[in-house]
Every structure is written in C-alpha cells, then in structure tokens.
Curated annotation (Swiss-Prot):
InterPro entries assigned: aa-tRNA-synth_I_CS, aa-tRNA-synth_Ia, Leu-tRNA-lgase_arc, Leu-tRNA-synth_Ia_arc/euk, M/V/L/I-tRNA-synth_anticd-bd, Methionyl/Leucyl_tRNA_Synth, Rossmann-like_a/b/a_fold, tRNAsynth_Ia_anticodon-bd
Catalytic activity: tRNA(Leu) + L-leucine + ATP = L-leucyl-tRNA(Leu) + AMP + diphosphate
Protein name in the entry: Leucine--tRNA ligase
Residues covered by region (Disordered): 928-950
One GO CC term on file: cytoplasm
Record keyword Cytoplasm present: yes
Length: 950
C-alpha cells in the first residue's frame, strides 16, 4: 500500500537504486524495433543547469515513451572535455582568481575545500563528470550508463583520429589562410564552446573604403559599399587619440582599437605616430570613388572599437547620420575652425525605393517621430530603411554604370571593382562586441596562415548535407528553413588548435583537433564504448578496426590479427552497430543549430553511407530563471542538482516539461515549481485513495458518467500519444495530467467510482515518461513489473461515446449557468425549475441547419420551410424572431445538440443537481410545464434550458 504522505526524495532514491541494480535501462540488440536517441553530452566546466535539465528531460521522456511502445531503446550519455576552457579554468582556480572563485562557490555550489583541488584539467574533468552523473541519476534519466565515456579517453582519441583520416582522404580537411575568432592569450582559434561572452557573434566582411587626407588614408568600414556614392562628410570622435600607422605601403589613420585589430590581419602594420581626433575635425577629405571633397565633423557617438574608428556619413539613407548632422546645425563648431553653415550640405540620393521619397532617412525619421540621435526609435528607423532598401531598392543614375542594379545584388559586384581600383579592402569584424574567451581575454578576428580547416563551404559537400536534411524529420518543421539557411551560409571552420585538451591530428601532431570538430559522430562511439568499458584491449585500435566496425570494410579475422581483439568480439561490435545505427532522434537546444547540429549532419554525410544518416532532429528553446537570462559564469543560475534538491525529481521534470513547447523559451519560476509540487501530491493522494477504496464494483453496469469518463480517457490517450509522437511535452502533459485531473474531479463530483481503478491503471502509464518515480511507486500496487517497461495505453475506439460526452457537457453547462445566476443574484435557492427546449425550437434549428449554406442562413428559405411545419406553424408569431437569432449564430450552429435527450438527461440527474445546490430541482419540458410562475419556459432553447430559481 502507498504511504499516507508523499515523500518525494525517499521514493525517488528507492526507484533509482532499483533501476540501477536491475539494469532496467540496459539495451542490447534483439528482434524488436530499435530506437536510438541521443542528446548533447555536457561540457565539463561547471555543474548542469536548468538549460541542460530541459533538453535532457525532453530526451528522457521521449526515450521512456518509446520504451513503453515496445521498442528497444538505446539512450546513452557521455562527457565532453576537449578544448581550452578546462585548461584555462584550472589555471584561474590555481591562481585563485577572485571572480572564478566567487562563480564556482556561490553559483555552482562547490565547497572551497573541493575547489582548491581543481587546479589541473584532469581534476576538473573528473570532478564535474562525477557531479554530472550524480545529477542525471538524481532526476531519474533512463540512461544505459555502461556506454559512458569522456572525450579525453584514449579509445575515443583513436576514434577521432580515424574520422579525421577519412575527412582528409576525401579532401574535406585542408590547410590555408582564413579569418577566425582568435584568443590572443591562448594563441588559438576559438569556437562557440570556448566563448564566455559574445558566443552569438559571427565574422562579417566589411568593406574598408580609403578616403584620402592629403597623403594619408582615412579608412571607413561599411557593410554597404554602394552608399559611398552618397557620402557628404566623415565622422571622427574628437575625444579619441588616433594612431598613425604604416599599413603595407600606405599611411593610415585609425583608432587604437582598430590598430590592434589590424595587427592580427595579413597586413604589415606598424605604428609611426599619433594624432588627436580634434585635429582632424574641420579638415577636408576626398571620396576615392566620386572625387568629392567632404568635411570631417565631430561625433562623440563614434565608437573607436567599431570598424576603423572613422565613419562615413550618408544622411540621405542613414537615419543616424541625418539626425547627427541635424543636431549640429545650430552647434558652435568654431573651436574646430568650422564656421560654414552645415545646412548647406546637400544630401545625395542614390537609391530609389518604393516606400520612400528622395531621402529615405528623412522620411523614416518623420514617419516614426524620431526626436534626435539618442531616441531609441533612431535604431528602429535605421533597420527599417536598411530592410526596405535591401529588398526593394534600386541604384540611381548617380552611381554611374551600376544604375538599375538591385541593392541586394550590388555588394559583391562593387566590392570587387573597388578592390581592383585600389580604393577598398576587406576588413573582418565581429557582428557584436565584445567577444570574450573563457580565459578572460578579449578575442579578435585573426587571419590565420597554415591553419587546418574543414571545408564546409565545399559545394558538393553542402549539396549532400541538404539532401540529408531533406530526408529527415525536423521538429518543429519551421526550423528546417533555419537549417537550410545556416548550411547555405556556412563557411570553412578552423578544426585544430595548439593548446588545450583533445586528440592530435594524426598527420600533424603539433595540432589538437578542435572541440566542436571532435563532437560530430560520437553517437557511433556509444556502440563501442560498452566493450571498451568492459575491458577490451585498446592499445592497438588501428584505423582498419574502425573501418570494419563502422563501415563494414575488411573482415573480423583481419581486424582481430591487427588489434589483438578476439574475432567474436569484433564481429559482435559490428553486429551491434548495424542494429543500432543510424540515430533515430537527436534532441538538442536551439543554440546548437548554428554549429554542433550542422557539423553533426556534415560529418555523418562525409563518413557514412546514406542508409546511416540521421533520421530526425528535435530542437527546444532556452530556460530563463525568474524572467532573467541564466549564465553559468555570471548568474543567475539554477543547477539541476539544486532544482531536484528543492523540488524533487518528478516535480522538476513535470514543471520543466510543461513549461513551454518546442523552440519557445521556458521560464523557471519557483512559485510555479511549488504549485506543481502541490499538483503532484494531489496525483499521489488520488492514487492512494483509489487503491484504498472498498466500494468499487468493476462489474457494475456502466452509468452515464462511467461512459463519459471512459470516453474521455480514450481521448486523453489519443492526445498524449499524438503529442509525444511530435515531441510536444507541454501538450502531452496538458492532456495526460492537467486535463485528466479535471476529468477525474468531474467524475468523482458526479458520483463516479466503479471505473477508478481502470482509469488509474491507464493514467499511471500515461504519466510514466514524465514522472517515473511516483508512477513506479503507484504501479507497484496496481500492476506487474516496472511501469517503465509496461505497455503504452492503446485507445479503445468502442469506448469513445460522443453521446455520453455531449450529455455530460450539457449537464455541466447547465450547472454552471445555475451557479452564475446564483452568484449574480446573490440568492440562496429554495427551489430550482429547469425547462428544456420546446419541440418547435428544435425543429426550427433542424431546418436552419438544412437550409444554411457556406455559413450563411437564408431567412426567406428558412421561414418558407418553417411555415410548412405543423409544430412551428402554431408558433408563427415567435418563429421569425427566433429565426433571426439563428441567422446571427449560424456559423456556430451544430446538429449535435439535436441528438440530446435534454429532458431525459436532466430528469435522470435531478437528484445530483438537488444535492449540488441543496434544494429541490424540478425538470419540465417548455412545451407544457405544470409550473412556470414567471414565464421562463419561453426562454428555453436547444442545448440551453431556461432556469427559474426561487
């Protein structure tokens, strides 16, 4: 029997122990249909947080669901440790960096005495691997832990070497010069996992246009080189001391920050002097494209860290330039030697766009009512003009031979021409700043020479990846367009570094394989990891071993002779791989769409035959905490361990899974979690009460409320099943938990009891993927074996009773109507009289449904038919008025109500209504009521009885 009190932690620890001892989630090949599901392995530089909780729990719920469908489910887990972050973290801990110590003691809850031990990468990996595993066990994930590994394991290193050998053979790994995100401190390229801040920043190729100031160059960075034809002035921040630098064979004037960035490019750069920005103000520069002489004006808004620190102004097409220039019209600039009237600066219109007149920037500012350059709406105006000009704009005659060219096509054409003329260069810059490495250093864009790259830009490779994507299920489907867009734009990526943890390039051992590049096909390694963990020899894992295991090349005997692994083991591993692969579902957070999930597809396409390509990807959103974005390096943060400690595993699972759907972001709120705990306790109490009841007669004839409840139960099975098939955990729980709670409340309120055990048996199985511990505890008292292995409920179509559902809906609505009248009138009823619809109104509704077409009711046709009906003819004075009412609501009319025996339903349930309201209830037909002191019977309509209360 269930205990009186729900003790979450005790129940959860009990079942976690039993599952592990009995190997309930161990998966081996057999005759069943297989389901291989994977989620991203966590990076071992901190404790698991609520973002992990959401992604991992979705994966576990789906794994449990498919297991109950009777499928053979493999749900494994491993740990990611390669790259530089862990090395950098160990150094910061060893140096007792105060920020790091605060983050890891306060946010991650690591005792100082433990943190003191984490001064080597190996210690950090070992500590967080154990913590992550404990956390995942504490929440009840149904993982086959025999297959775990860490990406620094020797066997995994051999696996990655094999993968990169194939990539190189196919020409996908090359050496060259490319712009990369670079950490000056670590002297390494950085990828998303290496970045502390600015992880969404991409590398943009700006055009540096070389304006001339005597014999010097004033380079201006722009994403829209076509606007050079409309430049009226340059902007310089007078408060910044600029550097004079020799860049190749030219002398440039740039901000100090720009100079720093230039030193990481493939240019020869040397500082030769300085010049205060204020000394540049008032001077005249020359536009290298148009030859126009333009004035340099002061602008404190110019960010020296953006571009070159010098900005070209195009007030006709850039709202911020227009506003800044307008703000200077009445300013005293005499200290810069500027005495001319800036109002005389003529705007230059160079783009024709349908939505605007000659000067789009001016029109947009006026349209949005932008006050000045500090108005937040100025940015909105800028984006609006840019978007409209990009999509609909065409260059005007002033641009010469480029006239008539659409704006969205001009950049590459013009850029190449300007480079050929020697008046422009490409300058790579981050899309957002700053970008901070996990070591704390500020990253730059560096042009790296002799760097190993993965050629993701290869057109043949791209086309194959798109082919793979086309054959996959993407959940939600609207994410497919984002995948296609990311694949189209994906460029070559640095795949090796010189520092950190990881696998060395087999042909160039000075380089370590980058941490995103080594985490692409690791799902295949889960098949092998079980044998490695069981003690298989790994010192001679040559490429031919992996060729056979994963590609079927060679023979078991050949592989055995090369590796020392016995023939039977080699053959079994190959058979296991053939059984389990490909991956049936990869579920992940949406932040990995732009990197890991793309590389996952790319590398599977490159390594494996089409039959082994992934079958489905599901993507979910982020998690915030009390409305704030979480950060494991800055806070706030809710660790998985903390969530389970405070709420219990099942409450944590239920709350996070019901919080949001698909790519919607979830918001963890502690009061919401507490409310969920109360609902889980209610579930437990209901189950205990049902188990303990001794007044249940399962052989009794089904009553109306029994038929209704069993019908609703079938619908809940159908809804929950459909939702889980579509990875919609929120919708699944709305049906399986919240709607079921409401259904049971109504069932018991109506006196239902004989089907409670039958209902509980189904309900517990519906809830098992979401709240497995409490469901195992209940199932132990009502079922056989483990609910985790119990068959998923199958709906019985013969129990779907629409008549019973309509009858109960009618009764419930009638009860609500009575309650509303009592509430409004503040009456304590002594007597309630109900009048069901008269026959003539039922017939009128029937005719209205027959003559209505396309949602419209022809009153003439209705009345013509009605007057030929004897029941209606006797009410010919009232019929037109009721017909008019029907005409207004024809779009909502349904024939279902005509199937209701309203008088019979209310008469049979008169006793129930009397008990509900504590007074006698009488039921009459409105056709001939024996008691109607206020004439209420005339108000009765189909589906809505008239109500009289004394």
């Amino acid at each position: 029997m269930l205990r009186n009190e729900y003790s979450a932690h005790e129940i959860e620890a009990k079942w976690q122990r039993i599952w592990e001892e009995e190997g309930v989630f161990h998966a081996e090949p057999d005759s069943r249909k297989k389901f291989f599901l994977t989620i991203p392995y966590p990076y071992l530089n901190g404790n698991l947080h609520a973002g992990h909780t959401r992604t991992f729990t979705i994966g576990d719920a789906i794994a449990r669901y498919h297991r109950m469908l009777g499928e053979n489910v493999l749900f494994p887990m491993a740990f990611h440790a390669t790259g530089t972050p862990i090395v950098g973290l160990s150094e910061l801990i060893a140096n007792r960096d105060p920020l790091i110590w605060d983050v890891y003691t306060r946010l991650h809850g690591i005792p100082e005495e433990e943190l003191e031990k984490l001064t080597t990468p190996e210690a950090i990996v070992d500590y967080f691997r154990k913590q992550a595993k404990l956390a995942m066990r504490s929440i009840g994930y149904s993982i086959d832990w025999r297959r775990e590994f860490t990406t620094t394991d020797p066997a995994y290193n051999r696996f990655i070497e094999w993968q990169f050998g194939i990539l190189r053979e196919k020409g996908y790994v090359t050496k060259g010069s490319h712009p990369v995100r670079w950490c000056p401190n670590d002297q390494n390229p950085v990828e998303d996992h290496d970045i502390l801040r600015g992880e969404d920043a991409t590398i943009l190729d700006f055009t540096l246009i070389k304006f001339r100031l005597d014999d010097k160059v004033l380079p201006c960075a722009t994403l829209r080189p076509e606007t050079v034809f409309g430049v009226t002035n340059l902007w310089v921040n007078p408060n910044v001391v600029h550097y004079i630098a020799r860049v190749n064979d030219e002398v440039w004037i740039v901000s100090p920050q720009a100079y720093h960035k230039l030193t990481f490019t493939d240019r020869s750069v040397k500082k030769i002097g300085e010049i205060p920005g204020e000394e540049l103000i008032g001077k005249k520069a020359r536009n290298p494209v148009t030859g126009d002489e333009i004035i340099i004006l002061p602008a404190t808004f110019v960010d020296p860290d953006s571009g070159s620190g010098i900005v070209m102004s195009v007030p006709a097409h850039a709202p911020l330039d227009y506003l800044a220039l307008r703000d200077l019209y009445d300013a005293d600039l005499s200290k810069y030697g500027i005495t001319e009237d800036l109002r005389k600066i003529k705007f230059i219109s160079l783009i024709s766009v349908p939505e605007y007149g000659e000067f789009p920037a001016v029109d947009a500012v006026n349209e949005l009512g932008v006050k000045d350059q500090n108005d937040p709406k100025a940015e909105e105006a800028t984006k609006l003009v840019y978007r409209r000009e990009f999509h609909n704009g065409v260059l005007k005659e002033i641009t010469g031979r480029y006239a008539g060219t659409p704006v969205h096509r001009i950049k590459d054409i013009l850029l190449q021409d300007l480079i050929n003329q020697g008046v422009a260069e490409i300058f790579y810059e981050f899309s957002e700043t700053p970008v901070i490495c996990r070591c704390g250093a500020r990253c730059v864009v560096k042009m790296v020479r002799d760097q190993w790259f993965l050629e993701y830009s290869d057109p043949v490779w791209k086309s194959r990846v798109l082919e793979c994507l086309a054959g996959m299920q993407i959940i939600p489907e609207e994410m497919r367009a984002e995948f296609i867009n990311k694949i189209d734009w994906l460029k070559d990526k640095a795949c090796a570094r010189r520092k950190g943890l990881g696998t060395r390039l087999p042909w160039d051992r000075e380089w370590l394989i980058e941490s995103l590049a080594d985490s692409t096909i690791y799902m295949a390694f889960y098949i092998l990891a079980k044998y490695v963990n069981a003690g298989m020899k790994i010192d001679r894992l040559v490429p031919q071993f992996f060729d056979y295991i994963f590609l079927g090349k060679g023979t078991p005997e050949e592989v055995s002779s090369l590796t020392g692994v016995d023939v039977d083991t080699v053959r079994r591993i190959r058979e296991d791989f053939e059984y389990w692969y490909p991956v049936d579902l990869r579920t992940s957070g949406k932040d990995l769409v732009a990197n890991h999930l793309l590389f996952f597809l790319y590398h599977h396409v490159a390594i494996f035959p089409e039959s082994l390509w992934p079958r489905a990807i599901a993507v979910n959103g982020f998690v915030s905490l009390e409305g704030q974005k979480m950060s494991k390096s800055r806070g706030p943060i809710l660790t998985l361990k903390q969530a389970v400690a405070e709420n219990g595993a099942d409450v944590t699972r239920l709350y996070i899974l019901a919080n949001a759907e698909y790519t919607q972001d979830a918001d963890w709120r502690n009061d919401g979690a507490q409310a969920t705990r109360g609902q889980v306790e209610r579930f437990y109490t209901l189950a205990r009460e049902i188990i303990e009841r001794n007044d249940i007669d399962e052989s009794a004839e089904l009553t109306l409320i029994d038929r209704w409840m069993l019908s609703r139960l079938q619908r809940r099975i159908i809804e929950t099943t459909d939702a889980l098939n579509n990875i919609q955990t929120r919708r699944a729980l709305q049906s399986a938990f919240y709607h079921m709670l409401n259904d049971l409340r109504w069932y018991e309120r109506r006196g239902g009891r004989n089907q409670l055990r039958r209902i509980l048996n189904v309900w517990v199985r519906l809830m098992a993927p979401f709240t497995p511990h409490i469901c195992e505890e209940i199932w132990q008292n009502i079922g056989e074996g483990y609910v985790s292995r119990a068959p998923w409920p199958v709906p019985d179509a013969s129990l779907i009773d629409e008549q019973a559902e309509r009858a109960e809906a009618y009764l419930e609505q009638t009860q609500k109507d009575i309650e509303e009248i009592i509430r409004v009138t503040k009456t304590k009823p002594r007597r309630i009289v109900l009048y069901t619809t008269p026959v003539w109104k039922r017939e009128m509704l029937r005719l209205a449904l027959e003559v209505s077409k396309g949602g419209r009711l022809d009153m003439g046709a209705l009345m013509k038919s009605a007057m030929g009906h004897p029941e209606i003819q006797s009410h010919k004075k009232d019929a037109p008025k009721y017909g008019g009412k029907l005409a207004k609501s024809v779009h909502a009319l349904s024939g279902d109500v005509l199937a209701l025996d309203e008088l019979g339903i209310l008469s049979r349930e008169r006793e129930y209504l009397s008990q509900a309201f504590g007074c006698p209830v009488e039921v009459y037909s409105a056709d001939n009521p024996p008691y109607d002191p206020k004439g209420r019977a005339q108000n009765a309509e189909p589906g809505r009885p008239a109500i009289y209360i004394e």
